[in-house]
Amino acid sequence: MRLCVQGMRCLRASTPRIVQLPRSSVLLRTACATRAYSSVPPTGSSDSVTIRGQTIKTDPEWFNVPNNVLEATSRKLHLLKDHPVSITRQIMQSNFPEPTFKYYNEFSPVVSTKQNFDSLGFPVNHPGRALSDTYYINSETLLRTHTSAHQADRFRGNESAGYLVSADVYRRDAIDRSHYPVFHQMEGAMSWDRTKVPNGDVAAAVWKDFEKLPVHGVKVDDPNPRNPLQDAHHTAAEAEAIGAHLKRSLENMVVDIFSRAKATALKEDPNFVDEPLQMRWVEAYFPFTSPSWELEVYYAGDWLEVLGCGVVNQDIYINAGVPNQLGWAFGIGIDRIAMLLFKIPDIRLFWSKDKRFLSQFEGVTDNLDKIKRFVPFSKYPPCPKDVSFWLSSTTAAGGNTKGTFHENDVMEIVRNVAGDVVEDVRLIDEFTHPKTGRKSMAYRIVYRSLERTLTNDEAVAFHEDVRQALVKELGVELR
């Protein structure tokens, strides 16, 4: 389910500033191998593309996957030995042990629109379906936008009481230090079957399982939320028991992660302030769970929004062919947790093949107690450049239909031209001419290489290519 913490936050003026950490899966929007995996680059022709051995027919009216994103489909960072994303996945996964939970880490990123949207109840006009937000191969096939694309299949397969799906996911998005068109999520769920628990008493069975969970000892604020129950499907006792099991399970994972981060910080940073960890549950409303919550953690002086979760909407079980089951699900963004755990300042670093980056984490996969903070090689100077243009029509940024302007189109063009040399792209001005009604937009593009100093001449060359690509692909008029 797509409990997307990002974009669905509830801001409260009376509480301290909250730093938004994860890109959760739809739920949350959100056997483990440790060897290195070979990377077979995707191949394509004018009418097809091959990704991880699967050849798919493309449709020119829909196909919008750039080469840099296609190339990323072969990387599998979440399975790469001694890579921070993979290490973080291992730590998360270790808190949901086999055989209760089965791990799925190898699913192809190519899914159907039915898997990614229909099975989760996305309306046909939902903005997440738009070409401006999602990478399509053809009208019925796309690169998954969340690990929840596999949720209905996992419930239908019914192979274990619980499961974890960890995977690379793809979204057309902004350009800055915490956003990248490819990132990684973990989604988990646990279910109970009315026909298999003693006397059909799900609440009693869940509480029995709850008593087996470890007790962490960290202060948690949980102010009895007023979330709506699914009265047609669940009793209040069932919802209470499932919610308690869900919260304790996730609290244990989060305490493990942040305790490791804190221990590393205390060891390596003499200025780190040692404050007790705190957690709080915040009432939330997501379309695919009810009741629903977000978990926030107080760490290093900030409240961090970590994940989204809830009691699974019963219709998802019913549509998956397992109507007697009920349970919980959660989603969490792996990359941003890894950025915090290893103090990595820029998400682009995860995709670097520079040994100065990768060598810093050697041996950690085999000993998770050896986690250490990233040490920057150098701070290379930025080269900011501005570009402004008139739109070819009066369509405002944010349009969602093919042929209209969308800011993500600008981001995609900049990435296609300059790749990971681009650190940040921001809208700095927009103006509508009072007489003609034409709209002008201005963006600041920051060019900065992570691996060497970028000369001004190189930045100028990249920027001119970006300007010309904007004209060619969007039909804008440069100012």
Where is each model-derived feature located?
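Fungal secretory targeting signals
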Residues: M1-L27
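Class II aminoacyl-tRNA synthetase-like tRNA-binding/catalytic domains
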Residues: R2-C10, S38-Q185, A189-S191, K196, ...
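Beta-rich nucleic-acid/ligand-interaction surfaces
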Residues: Y103-R129, A261-Y299, L427-T436
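Short secondary-structure junctions
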Residues: F96-K102, D256-T264, P270-L277, V414-V425, ...
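A carboxyl-terminal module marker
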Residues: V282-R479
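Internal, charge-rich low-complexity segments
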Residues: S191-D221, A261-L266
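A short, surface-exposed helix-loop junction/capping segment
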Residues: V65-L77, V220-A237, C383-K385
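Prokaryote-biased recognition of long, low-complexity C-terminal linker/tail segments
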Residues: R129-A130, T134-I137, T147-Y170, D176-P181, ...
